[in-house]
Amino acid sequence: QVHAAVLKDLGRCDILVNGAGGNNPRATTDNEYHHEAKEGGKSFFDLDAAGVDFVFKLNFQGTLLPTQAFAKDMVEKKAGCILNVSSMNAYRPLTKIPAYSAAKAAVSNFTQWLAVHFANAGIRVNAIAPGFFVSNQNRGLLFNPDGTVMG
């Protein structure tokens, strides 16, 4: 439906930017290292499968599904560009966010696969891997309640 609306309003897609991304508190840990785990804290063993699934659906399927929808136009034209937003976490994962790091690694790997898959179709596929941005979503992972950086 989205593809049809875009095609109707804007025409064929020449450049696709897959920028979906995010995390979920149920897919994070409270401590950087296992030996630091405290009673009542969330450890690796407490990761919620639904939270991890949410993170993978948002990040990986948020790249896969738009590519399936919009790359068809590029294949027909034998031209196009797909830019996926990965993360430096794909290459050097931060602690406490295992699902996000793994999902972005999947995006990076998928990007490499797509680049080969569409090479002879005239479609260029690349990814960018920005560093870390502080947001309300991740502030609690980086800062103490008093605003100082966690050490």
Predicted regions, residues:
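Active-site helix of classical SDR
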Residues: 67, 103
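Alpha-helical segment proximal to the catalytic Tyr-Lys
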Residues: 72, 116-117
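Conserved amphipathic alpha-helix within the SDR
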Residues: 1-11
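Active-site loop-to-helix junction immediately N-terminal to the catalytic Tyr of the SDR YXXXK motif
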Residues: 93-101, 113, 141
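A glycine/serine/threonine-rich, flexible loop-to-helix segment
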Residues: 29-35, 40-41, 120, 132-151
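Residue(s) in the substrate-gating loop at a strand-loop-helix junction
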Residues: 87
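Catalytic Tyr-X3-Lys loop
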Residues: 14, 35-64, 79, 83, ...
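Conserved mid-core segment of classical short-chain dehydrogenase/reductases
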Residues: 23-53, 76, 96-99, 139
